[in-house]
């Protein structure tokens, strides 16, 4: 039997990350900057200038004849036509992959129109496809929201799993004085975290290993999914990180309806088995008793006194998802939020090109931003959100 040297060991699953359009391309650049290893990066865009500035390993100019390299003009149908024109190039770039991430910022032209075409080609090749899409801010206007709704509905039909990230919820996690361009930069970075949180479960060597087969078992034909990341340090870091992961303000619906859960605990040399067990108990208690649960533990020596927990929840039935989303929309559509949106819209030029916002601001870490627990009502501060939602749903059933 031949000897396998450490330098010869590589990830056997081929993972490709495709950034489609401006926001998707920015997410790819951030992943490259973050040193995400074991994956191949592809940027696809109708905008030739944006592609020129991309750090991706492979760059594909979509629809040369359709757009002339000048972009899709915020029209998803132009993005769709451009992707169909370049279908053979897309297919060649995706060949050989076991898993493909399609990342888009829904609402624009290229990402919204071309994203689902890329996913469709990948599925035709028998590849496991995960879509990660951000929803636009309310202040970006009704037209962009309609574009996003159409894009997400199309993407959902052509992926195994779809993770949607609502940009409006970023407003719960950042300072109100944060400049507009920096807010878009933060939104782009959420895409990076969505992809990195899943891919590292496969590419990073673990103390308790997860592999591609584990991820595929949870994410194949899974439909809508939730992702949460929690970070904590100190005496109660395991419970705090687990709670943050399942109650992140970026999670649109409760985790308790999940039929499949994949989570990973990452820590330094001081991480203990009892901490892994503590985190596992919190996460498993939040989901269906019949849920298929797979977990791993990864050692990162550079993490001193800190635990990071990544949770991927899938297998929600559509009725549950729609019901809970309706509750969330009603909770966020307050007169105050409506008034704030009107004020912002009146001062915003929505012809803004924010794809290069990363170059304008410092590359400070925003990782902790997504792991803060959602604000609770004062009289229910000790009751986790998922338990309140479960109690509410059970009450409706009894009635």
Residue ranges and their predicted role:
Residues 1-399:
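Tubulin/FtsZ superfamily GTPase core signature
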């Amino acid at each position: 039997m031949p000897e396998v040297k450490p330098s010869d060991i590589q990830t056997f699953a081929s993972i490709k990350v495709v950034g489609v359009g401006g926001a998707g391309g920015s997410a790819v650049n951030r992943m490259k900057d973050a040193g995400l290893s074991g994956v191949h990066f592809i940027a696809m865009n109708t905008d030739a200038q944006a592609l020129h500035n991309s750090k991706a390993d492979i760059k594909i100019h979509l629809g040369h004849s359709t757009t002339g390299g000048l972009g899709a003009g915020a029209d998803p149908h132009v993005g769709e036509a451009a992707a169909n024109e370049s279908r053979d190039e897309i297919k060649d770039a995706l060949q050989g992959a076991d898993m493909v991430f399609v990342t888009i910022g829904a609402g624009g032209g290229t990402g919204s129109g071309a994203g689902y075409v890329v996913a469709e080609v990948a599925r035709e090749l028998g590849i496991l496809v995960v879509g990660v899409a951000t929803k636009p801010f309310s202040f970006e206007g009704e037209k962009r929201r309609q574009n996003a709704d159409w894009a997400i509905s199309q993407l959902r039909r052509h992926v195994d799993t779809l993770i949607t990230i609502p940009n409006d919820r970023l407003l719960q996690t950042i300072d109100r004085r944060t400049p507009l361009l920096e807010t878009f930069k933060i939104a782009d970075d959420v895409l990076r975290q969505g992809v990195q949180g899943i891919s590292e479960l496969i590419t990073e060597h673990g103390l308790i290993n997860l592999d591609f087969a584990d991820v595929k078992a949870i994410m194949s034909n899974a439909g809508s999914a939730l992702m949460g990341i929690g970070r904590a340090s100190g005496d109660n870091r395991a419970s705090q990180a687990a709670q943050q992961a399942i109650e992140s303000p970026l999670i649109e619906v409760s985790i308790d309806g999940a039929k499949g859960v994949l989570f990973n605990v990452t820590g330094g040399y001081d991480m203990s088995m009892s901490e892994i067990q503590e985190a596992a108990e919190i996460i498993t208690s939040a989901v269906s008793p019949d849920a298929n649960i797979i977990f791993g533990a990864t050692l990162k020596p550079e993490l001193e006194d800190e635990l990071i927990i990544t949770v991927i929840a899938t297998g929600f039935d559509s009725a549950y998802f729609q019901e809970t989303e309706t509750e969330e929309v009603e909770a966020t559509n307050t007169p105050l939020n409506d008034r704030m949106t009107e004020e912002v819209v009146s001062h915003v030029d929505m012809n803004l090109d924010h794809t290069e916002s990363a170059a304008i601001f410092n590359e400070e870490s925003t990782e902790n931003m997504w792991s803060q627990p959602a604000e609770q009502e004062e009289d229910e501060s000790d009751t986790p959100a998922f338990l309140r939602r479960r109690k509410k749903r059970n009450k409706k059933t009894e009635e």
